[in-house]
Amino acid sequence: MQVAYHWQVISRLLIALLRFYKLFISPLLGPRCRFAPSCSEYAMTAIGRFGPLRGSWLAARRLGRCHPFHPGGFDPVPDAPASPSSSCSCKGPHP
């Protein structure tokens, strides 16, 4: 239980840093992101949905695609994988 709490604290800290960037730094730089949602919104959603490790990895991959040679466009955060019991059509119990 304690480990999960630490990951939650790290997620909240990362999201707070992203909000700070979005409120105070991003307006100084002007609109630059070629994606929708913006890279900072994408990162906040990914960290909130997948936690700090996988969410940060997804955000880093997104930043790697954010360059002048990529067309950009709509690029949402992937959905969290469904639990095995909700995607399985069998009638038996799952371990």
Curated annotation (Swiss-Prot):
NCBIfam families: membrane protein insertion efficiency factor YidD. GO terms for cellular component: plasma membrane. InterPro entries: Membr_insert_effic_factor_YidD. Transmembrane segments: none annotated. It comes from Xanthomonas oryzae pv. oryzae (strain MAFF 311018). It is a peripheral membrane protein. HAMAP family: UPF0161_YidD (MF_00386). PANTHER family: MEMBRANE PROTEIN INSERTION EFFICIENCY FACTOR-RELATED. Keywords: Cell inner membrane, Cell membrane, Membrane. This is Putative membrane protein insertion efficiency factor.
